Amino acid sequence: MKFVATLIACGLSGLALAAPTATVNSLGKRAADDAAFGYASLNGGTTGGAGGTTTTVSSYAAFTAAVSSDAKKVVYVSGPIKQSAKQVKVGSNTSIIGKDSTAVLEGFGLLVKEKSNVIIRNLGVKKVLAENGDAIGIQYSNNVWVDHVDVSSDRDHDKDYYDGLIDVTHAADYVTISNSYIHDHWKASLVGHSDNNGDEDKGHLRVTYANNYWSNINSRAPSLRFGTGHIYNSYFENVSDGINTRDGAQVLVESNQFVGSSKALYSTDDGYAVERDNDFGGAKNTALQGTLTTVPYSYSLLGSSKVKSAVVGVAGQTLKF
């Protein structure tokens, strides 16, 4: 059975329609023309560097220089770049796109701070030490689309050896994380960094997680404080502690499948959730009942029984440019 939800909030019009999941055969054709969806499609939309200059880089120095300004630009990454360094700061109006699956940043991550209109697609980021920050950090920023990325570390070290894979903090807003492979990590993705930051975060931190493959994760898949989350069409494999809603967060969880999880959907510190058509694989939903039943954009649901076949092998760096 195919589940389809079309949810339009009152007072909003002209929202771009998008199909979050592409078939394998259509990925290459659609890669260059795909548009941001979910929360990143709101607030004027997220177009990155469309219409700006185009550059291809293959070294750390060239990459750092290419992404820094706020001018419209598309930066293609060709091949791997390895450097043990602090996060590279990304300017507004930027698209960072890996040309293929070899475009991997190792040892350093990306920081989108006090910026807007940023797209990160088809890029790998791995093994960023905690002292160097998150693999992808989004702070004080709005309209960011992270799509078809492969982010990971390992679990051979203790939980504090690496920091987060994709963290959205300090009142960041209108963010979508989609079609991504998030794996082999202790604490994967955090929305809202502190129980004491409610004054700044409340009314912000609107994040969509769609069509993602989470694998071999200990916790934070994701963990949300204060904000609003929509998590759908995702496959969770060997994720011990999955979706954690806390500190008043409201989360809508739909059409997901969990295999090998201890806690699929749960609440600490009074977080809330509404769940529909999820296969928790024997784990339980212990979150407090929430009120988030609709979101202000259109989307399509796969149905929990179809998520694995649609997401595994498609999520991650599967595009070519």
From Swiss-Prot:
One of its GO terms (biological process) is cell wall organization. Residues 1-18 form the signal peptide. The active site is at residue 220. Ca(2+) binds at residues 134, 163, 167. One of its GO terms (molecular function) is pectate lyase activity. It is found in: Secreted. Its EC number is 4.2.2.2. GO terms for cellular component: extracellular region. This is Probable pectate lyase A. It comes from Aspergillus fumigatus (strain ATCC MYA-4609 / CBS 101355 / FGSC A1100 / Af293).
